[in-house]
Amino acid sequence: MLLMHKVLLRILFLIPVIGYANDPFEEINREVWTFNEGVDNRIARPVAEFYDDVVPIPVQSSITNFFSNLDEIDNSINQLLQGKPVAAGNDFARFLVNTTFGFLGFFDVASIMGLEEHDEDFGQTLGVWGVPTGPYLMLPFYGPSSPRDLVGRPISGVLSGTFSIEESDVRLSITALDALETRARLLDVESLIVGDKYTFIKNSYLQYSEFEVQDGEEIEDDFTDDMDDFLLDD
């Protein structure tokens, strides 16, 4: 989704000035990282590159919109749990509009109507409730995570539209396509990675998690201050 791309670009600018050291399992995490990189290099990235080369951009955008729409119920429920009823109503309205007028969400009519897109999950809700992120974890196949997200992600998975599909073959196929679409969206971002890739991904993940919990407010202020300092120094 375009929202995630915008956020990731902001995070990439912040990585050099904000560091994280909450990685007590770094030795094991790096071993898992090496394994994941091997799987990605041999399978995930080539398939994602093929998808990106073969599937037209408008079709890719429609697929992205479809999966974003499946997450709107999860978004709206977590907005309520975080004490944001107006945002919850916005996200539920997005689901209704895009499902009805956007052909099951393949077209983002809601954004055209001025309904803002959000990205919420139960891991963020736990963060809003004061649950700490915990130590950084690198999971086999899955990638970056934390104890808080290990609890939150499965619950958000149950709240997503995919979980409600009864046919297991269809559900697995949609889940696989979702993973492929997500990997393809990250191809453009990879070129911006500098230095030790493991450390960069770790800091990006932790910073992005904090950004989501804060709704970008505190980090936006930090970003603005850093840019002001940079411009003044020049």
Predicted feature residues:
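Helix-loop segments that flank and shape redox-cofactor active sites
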Residues: 50-55, 78-88
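Mid-length scaffold segments of soluble, non-membrane domains
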Residues: 69, 82-144
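Short N-terminal segments immediately surrounding and downstream of signal-peptide cleavage
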Residues: 22-36
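Bacterial N-terminal signal peptides that target proteins for export
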Residues: 1-9
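A structured, mid-to-C-terminal "fold-capping" secondary-structure block
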Residues: 23, 124, 129-234
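Hydrophobic h-region of N-terminal signal peptides that target proteins for export
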Residues: 12-21
